[in-house]
Amino acid sequence: MGFKTKMQNLFLGNTDDLDELEYENDATINKGRGASQQEYDEYYEDSTPTVTQKEDPVRQSNIVPIHTKKAKSQVILSEPRVFNEAQEIGEHLRQNRAVIVNMQRMSKDQSRQMINFLSGVVFALDGTITTISQNTLLCVPNNVELAGSISNLLGEDDINHKGW
């Protein structure tokens, strides 16, 4: 026995017995006259490995489309009659919606309260509040940028309005 054979026997066990078993199985099929077609087919049917297709796991793509649809911005038109409706306007601002507030139907005291409340909400949200007309305000959250000025279109009497 050579060194290589000793190492194989140590790790794999004695392989001489396995070789003899394989030859014995082959001898039973051949029987000295050649195997019949049926014996040949039976032998190779049993020994053919079954092939199973391995499904590749579904890989999720890291590709993101360039032109994604952005969420639509909304502008809410509000015409409150009492100060109690101010909380609803504040909720719209918190949800990053611009709000136009028409206070023509409110009393002067309640419209002052509304302006004070909305000024606080807009300040807390880092937004902007702008007078559009005599009794109308535009309140926008920080995700909306205002450009331009309306005061140039108003007369001096409208700018110095003492209604509030």
Curated annotation (Swiss-Prot):
Keyword set, alphabetical order: Cell cycle, Cell division, Cytoplasm, Septation
Cellular component GO terms held in the UniProt record: cytoplasm
One family name in Pfam for this protein: SepF
SUBUNIT field: Homodimer. Interacts with FtsZ.
Stated name of the protein: Cell division protein SepF
InterPro entries xref list: Cell_div_SepF, Cell_div_SepF/SepF-rel, SepF-like_sf
Region (Disordered): 29-57
Family: Belongs to the SepF family.
